[in-house]
Amino acid sequence: LGRTRRPPIFPTEQAYPMRILELKAMRGPNSWSVRRHHLIVMRLDIEDLEQRPTDKIPGFYERITTMLPTMVSHRCSEDHEGGFWSRVKRGTWMGHVIEHIALEIQTLAGMETGFGRTRSTREKGVYNVVFSYVEEPVGLFAAKSAVRIAQALIDGTPYDLEADIQQMRELREESRLGPSTASIVHEAVGRGIPYLRLNGQSLVQLGHGVHQKRIRATITSKTSNIGVEIACDKEETKQLLESYEIPVPKGRVVRTEEGLKDALTVVGYPCVIKPIGGNHGRGATIG
């Protein structure tokens, strides 16, 4: 039996919009690469585009070379400058194109990346698109953005590329390590020591297994300071316990009225609102 198809979003376009089936970030040695620890893995259904490689989409080559001219530096399997353009002109599948777009827009946002792989799966039209990232939130955003960009190029509709690039720059500033922590991590990488960020701030694990050490900014795990700071932060404590499959209440950090509405759709009622740094029930509202 064939898959049930949805009505097209763009009535004049024969292909159905692509769908991201799964999206995750690798943070250590993985099945795609032992050496490259920071990879985005996207399971992508290209729908009817399986029957329409790039050479079968009128105007696609001209549109992508106009929107992303710097991709001329992508060698791909051709091993020469402009190699990827040659692949697009001869005909390649959309998962492969999205891989290269995701890498390029990260580069345009100031984060040099270069590793990518696209592999078919046992399900027709479904691909695993894998590419490297520098900052995890940026990599996840780049995956979604690359799919949107590719769809716009297929449909021949305008797309504000600069807005996405600016948002990636902002995400990088929000998530990047501070100068002291970044210096330690950079030195560890230079010595072949893998690292893993354990939260959105400066808590970092160096090494794996029995040899692992942890730092928070410039404080090491040889003191109890890290544990004390985590215990004083409700959200961070909850995230840490949850990562070890310890049951914790659903919760979100809220800073705006819109954020509160979004959080309530996840948490539901009844709920408790309390200061993130409060104690003894001070400032708590129940309802």
Feature roles, as predicted:
Residues 174-177, 185:
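Hydrophobic alpha-helical hairpins/lids featuring a short glycine-rich hinge
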Residues 183-203:
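Structured, non-catalytic alpha/beta "coupling" segments that mediate domain-domain communication
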Residues 11-164, 171-173:
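Long, compositionally biased, glycine/small-hydrophobic-enriched stretches that function as flexible linkers
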Residues 207-213:
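Glycine-rich loop at the start of a catalytic domain that most often binds anionic cofactors/ligands
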